[in-house]
A protein has these predicted regions:
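Conserved mixed alpha/beta catalytic, RNA-binding, or beta-rich assembly cores of soluble enzyme
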Residues: 175-202, 206-284
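N-terminal, Lys/Arg-enriched amphipathic/low-complexity engagement segments
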Residues: 27-95
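A generic structural signal for residues embedded in beta-strands
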Residues: 57, 116-119, 216
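Intrinsically disordered, low-complexity linker/loop segments enriched in Gly/Pro
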Residues: 97-101, 107, 122-210
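Bacterial N-terminal signal peptides
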Residues: 7-18
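Short alpha-helix capping/helix-loop boundary micro-motifs
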Residues: 38-44, 100-106, 198-203, 299, ...
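Short, Lys/Arg- and Gly-enriched loop/turn segments at beta-strand edges
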Residues: 62-74, 124-134, 222-232, 334-336
Length: 360
């Protein structure tokens, strides 16, 4: 993956990292390497790496234990062999309030509160030939319309990168992790893995596929990154409460930018794809989440982007507000995670200055 323009510009602020010293490690999903249902500043890291290092992380789906999958028609040979020991090996007392089995936390040794942790999504692999989708009784965006539970198994074609939803209905796959986050502030305690917040977490943002870059304000020593809730695909809204839930392995690179969250006044995560800048907002109220996402994009365009990259156009807040209204998209991310999510996508193609256009 080629780093994005802003990521390239931002690297001038990160700790000096020797290329020779960079390492790649693998973190499998086992009873001792997962955080079941929570993010926490008090969690003990299962792996510690350094700024610039890469970690390959194996993750579990939210489809449930092997017996549930078999009851829905999945052949035992199609279920990862490590899933049963995972479910049997994590005591109830060690589980948090949420339902996601997250791999991690991974500590980045240099990260401290006030820093920005940059996470580059380098690779995502589909690990099984099936996904599940389902809703519980009274769950999802229309609980009164569907007062019962329903689950289905959906075959995946990993070669064609499609899902066979039904005869005559084929869904293109765009794998991503529904949950990618760091520890929230210590005062949040053991934060439920379901609602996204200022730590990121269960953002369920389908834009965050391979090639995306996330920027988190660090709240705890080590940052404590976790990932899981693999999706083979999803529609904006995720209205029945699940996507094409599946097993993914992700390759992530971590880069620490010392003091940048303090200097930028960055309070909420933001992201980039190869084609867009992304701001996010999360709230129990959809209007509030939308206001947050729009304000975060205004702040990025008018205050943060040029400060990081002098080639970025200088925009007033008035101009940034107008640019969002005339050329950017405000999208619902999801409507089912307690806190609704909204994101603003600002296309990089808008910025046509010669120096911007010449950058990789």
């Amino acid at each position: 993956m080629r780093p994005s323009r802003l990521a390239l510009a931002a690297t001038t602020f990160c700790l000096s990292v020797s290329l020779a010293a960079q390492t790649t490690q693998t973190l499998l999903a086992t009873p001792t390497t997962v955080a079941w249902g929570y993010y926490s500043a008090q969690a003990k890291p299962v792996l510690t790496v350094h700024s610039g290092d890469t970690v390959i992380m194996q993750t579990a789906s939210t489809c449930g234990p092997p017996d549930r999958l078999e009851a829905e028609g999945v052949k035992p040979s199609e279920i990862p062999a490590w899933l049963d020991p995972l479910y049997k090996g994590v005591p109830i007392s060690d589980r948090g309030p949420g339902g996601h089995i997250l791999t991690g936390p991974v500590a980045i040794a240099e990260a401290q509160p006030g820093d920005i942790l940059e996470v580059r999504v380098l690779k995502i692999s589909l690990d099984t030939d099936f996904a599940c989708n389902g809703f519980g009784a009274g769950r999802g965006f229309l609980p009164d319309d569907f007062p019962y539970g329903h689950t289905r198994i959906i075959p995946l074609n990993r070669t064609a990168m499609t899902a066979d939803f039904a005869p005559g209905i084929t869904i293109p796959l765009h794998p991503f992790f529904g949950s990618m986050g760091i520890a929230p502030p210590e005062s949040a305690g053991k934060w439920n893995s379901a609602p996204p917040w200022m730590h990121g977490g269960n953002m369920d943002n389908k834009e965050l596929t391979v090639g995306s870059v996330l920027f988190y304000p660090v709240h705890a020593p080590g940052a404590l990154f976790e990932a899981g809730d693999g999706h083979a695909g999803q529609g904006n809204g995720e209205v029945d409460i699940t996507a094409l839930e599946t097993f993914l392995t992700g390759t992530f690179q971590f880069i620490v930018h010392k003091g940048e969250a303090t200097r930028e006044h960055l309070l909420w995560p933001r992201a980039e794809t190869p084609s867009a800048y992304i701001s996010m907002g999360f709230s129990e109220d959809l209007k509030t989440a939308t206001e947050m996402a729009v304000r975060n994009m205004i702040t990025f365009l008018a205050e943060q982007a040029h400060a990081q990259n002098p080639d970025f156009p200088v925009l007033s807040r008035d101009d940034a507000y107008a640019l969002i209204s005339t050329a950017c998209d405000v999208d619902i991310t999801q409507l089912v995670d307690t806190k609704d999510g909204v994101h603003v996508l600002c296309p990089k193609a808008l910025f046509t200055g010669p120096k911007m256009a010449s950058k990789p």
